[in-house]
Amino acid sequence: MTQLAQQEKKQTYNFNKLQKRLRRNVGNAIADFGMIEDGDKVMVCLSGGKDSYTLLDILLNLQQSAPIKFDIVAVNLDQKQPGFPEHVLPEYLESIGVDYKIVQENTYGIVKEKIPEGKTTCSLCSRLRRGILYRTATELGATKIALGHHRDDMLATLFLNMFYGGKMKSMPPKLISDDGKQIVIRPLAYCKEKDIEKYAIAKKFPIIPCNLCGSQPNLQRQVVKEMLNTWDRQYPGRLETMFSAMQNITLSHMCDPKLFDFKGIKHGQLIDGIEGDTAFDEERITPMQFEDEDQTDFSNNEMINFKEVN
């Protein structure tokens, strides 16, 4: 076997390994949070970035082997930003044969009119985009709206809320809209951004750059993201441990009286499921081990039994 053939074989092996890991993580998230049910019509919001491309690709892959039946429609919101390559997404979606809809709304013009030059436009832009996507989901008869946020986004949001908002709050993997009419899901909740980046490169998705609007970057989020990336380099496995902590919350050892009845604690009271006091003890914490990235699994349940699809 030539050196080139060996290299190609290794690349194929690594890609298959990566795809299986993403399939497993998405399948686990779907199962754990009841994201997709039999008969659902899932509207995948496609921005043209690596995350939403990967989300659509993996869901289409799983759709072929799922024990339940669900439909997929891809939706892109063309916000009329100058320089936006309008042909890229339709050409890609037609090439893979998926149902899609391009919604054209000049939210860019509204944002430029309302927000002073140089200020961050993300907040208003997000509100406008959300309203349009909710309306589109209703028009299409979609029962679920799938977004491309991943594990690293959820961790960054947790620290953003702690550092700047004084809240222990992250992105939920599944939520219902304020009016109760739309259910939003994040099937990439267990997926690492590094895996998504590798997958997008391997699949050669036609990525559309996200710097078209000219808005200043979200500096707070960027600071938090750089902090997390530094931790990940210096302390491998720390992000996995922190995400695991989001799934293992002991309310009796937090400080929110709305979530735990501290006033109701009485002498002689024994409460099932409540951890004891370690205030006078040195608490020994055994570090979690995540040596093999293939074994990184945040699921509490068995994943939906998807068959392998090449």
Swiss-Prot record:
EC number: 2.8.1.-
Keywords carried by this UniProt record: 4Fe-4S, ATP-binding, Cytoplasm, Iron, Iron-sulfur, Magnesium, Metal-binding, Nucleotide-binding, RNA-binding, Transferase, tRNA processing, tRNA-binding
Cited CDD domains: TtcA-like (cd24138)
Motif (PP-loop motif): 47-52
Pfam entry (one): ATP_bind_3
Pathway: tRNA modification
Catalytic activity line of the entry: cytidine(32) in tRNA + S-sulfanyl-L-cysteinyl-[cysteine desulfurase] + AH2 + ATP = 2-thiocytidine(32) in tRNA + L-cysteinyl-[cysteine desulfurase] + A + AMP + diphosphate + H(+)
GO biological process: tRNA thio-modification
The keyword ATP-binding is annotated on this UniProt entry: yes
Cellular localization per UniProt: Cytoplasm
GO molecular function, one term: magnesium ion binding
Binding site for [4Fe-4S] cluster: C122, C125, C213
Primary localisation category: cytoplasm
Cofactor: Mg(2+); [4Fe-4S] cluster
Transmembrane feature ranges: none
Cofactor comment text: Binds 1 [4Fe-4S] cluster per subunit. The cluster is chelated by three Cys residues, the fourth Fe has a free coordination site that may bind a sulfur atom transferred from the persulfide of IscS.
Keyword hit for Oxidoreductase: no
GO CC annotations on file: cytoplasm
InterPro entries xref list: Rossmann-like_a/b/a_fold (IPR014729), TilS/TtcA_N (IPR011063), tRNA_Cyd_32_2_STrfase (IPR012089), tRNA_thiolation_TtcA_Ctu1 (IPR035107)
Entry-linked PANTHER family: AMINOTRAN_5 DOMAIN-CONTAINING PROTEIN, SULFURTRANSFERASE-RELATED
Function: Catalyzes the ATP-dependent 2-thiolation of cytidine in position 32 of tRNA, to form 2-thiocytidine (s(2)C32). The sulfur atoms are provided by the cysteine/cysteine desulfurase (IscS) system.
Note: The thiolation reaction likely consists of two steps: a first activation step by ATP to form an adenylated intermediate of the target base of tRNA, and a second nucleophilic substitution step of the sulfur (S) atom supplied by the hydrosulfide attached to the Fe-S cluster.
Quaternary context: Homodimer.
Family: Belongs to the TtcA family.
Designated name of the protein: tRNA-cytidine(32) 2-sulfurtransferase
Gene label: ttcA
